[in-house]
Amino acid sequence: MVTINLSPHKSKAGHIMFRSHMNKPAMFKYVWQVVRRHFAGRLMRLCIIALTMLGVQIIPAAAAPLIQKIGASLSHPWGMDFLDERHLFVTERSGNLYLVDLFTGSRNSIGNLPAVGAAQQGGLLDVAVLANQNSQEKDDAVIYLCYSLKIGKQTVTAIDRAGFDGANLTNRRTIFQANNPTARAIHYGCRLVLDQSHLYASLGERGNRHDAQDPTLHAGAIVRLFHDGSIPADNPKQAGWAPELFSKGHRNPQGLAVNPETGVIWAHEHGPRGGDEINIIQAGQNYGWPKVSHGEEYSGGSIGSGTKAPGITDPVWVWTPSIAPSGMAFYRGAMFPNLNGHLLVGSLKFKRLYLVVLEKGLPVRDAIMLDG
């Protein structure tokens, strides 16, 4: 039996202990790897789904966290998504993509990957899977990769679409390439999420903050494409906007999730010194960076005109001091009924998993579910 005690922050949430009655040590190895290293990606989804597969129950507990680590670590894992109940794609920032068997702990390296510009914050970042719901075959899935593409001495954020034959990506092609190349290897964003018809991708401003307000650039934006990479005709038609743009004014968004109750996209992004945000993404809206910010310069001092301005959509949640959010998921399921409809967010800075409690569709408080 594997036991995990989870001690949330002092709040009405109380203490929680996850207890498994199934012997799945190999799967737990990968749960722990993700929790321990807190990589950007679908951290929360892995924790919840893998624990669910372990046969987890929630019971009150007050003991200190007790987590068993089994197996080798990954090197800078960044993103992940499930191929099926048993198999998980995991990216390593250096350029590797693995298919992990959660029952045995084995992992296979996937071939025919794009060459990536792996430097500083760049590399092979997110992966998303569009599964064929009418088939049990792995090779019917469509795989999307978001990564930093090297162009001379510069890089851009790119997205590839491919099939999968069980060992290699097939018919891989680039369906999106950002139009703001720069030598600065930071703030790629690069989070992917799918709904029934669309692929959404978050794009950072690459450290060139004022590009987030340039309507012609993909910098500091959420873009929306169809699954095949074509551009929806009903994307916002704001003055001067590039046709792929869905929203603008973002700094470095590394969390995207579809609210299962509304179908609306939620995003979170890194602030500077304080001012990490959760935003509900609405077509054609400007989320303010760097005209406004709830954070301040790293050297001290305000940014822009304050926290509000005409024509700017306010965040629905702000963390100050920063938690460095990365990865986000809404929980929906029968295993943990108390979590239903609420949001889970990873923290790179504090190596934590946060529960963000929603009431009437908006965040009202948070609690620490995993710490350290």
Question: What are the residue ranges of the model-derived segments?
Answer:
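Short, charged, low-hydrophobicity "junction" segments
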Residues: 58, 170-178, 297-304
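N-terminal secretory signal peptides that target proteins for export/translocation
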Residues: 1-41
